[in-house]
Amino acid sequence: MTTAHPAEAMFAADEASRSLGIELLEHGPGRAELRMTVTRAMVNGHGIAHGGYVFLLADTAFACACNSHGPVTVAAGADITFVAPAHAGDVLVARAEERTRFGRSGIYDVSVRRGDEVIAEFRGRSRSVGRATGDAPKESQ
């Protein structure tokens, strides 16, 4: 029996992302690529994809990339710049790449694209919490 890669194990347990139809396409050390189709339920009052869903896609790619090294890693912060609108039916691909890791921290950039067009640019800052993927969090004292 083989053990799932840390990014695969984390994504398999991510009900929020999987329930939106997000798919993990590829992953490797410090990188991940995910895909999501914008549904009618993801469109806001302006007729464009709600920024929260675009952020969620980018954040999920970030999570897969920063958890690819093994220890459980969480977001310490993130910023997003929306470059172009997405619409119902658009297929978005988020590619996350590690820029640097230092100590228990890291910096990751994620580009969200519709084909060749950039929809959003995301920068995430990560922090390793030091437990293995799948371990239960320690209860606070």
Predicted regions and their residues:
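Hot-dog-fold acyl-thioester-processing enzymes
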Residues: A16-S19, R35-A61
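HotDog/MaoC-like acyl-thioester-processing domains
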Residues: M1, P85-A88, E97-Q141
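Short, electropositive, low-hydrophobicity segments enriched in small/polar residues
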Residues: L25, G51, F55-L56, A88, ...
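Hydrophobic residues in beta-strands and at strand termini
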Residues: M36-V38, F82, S128
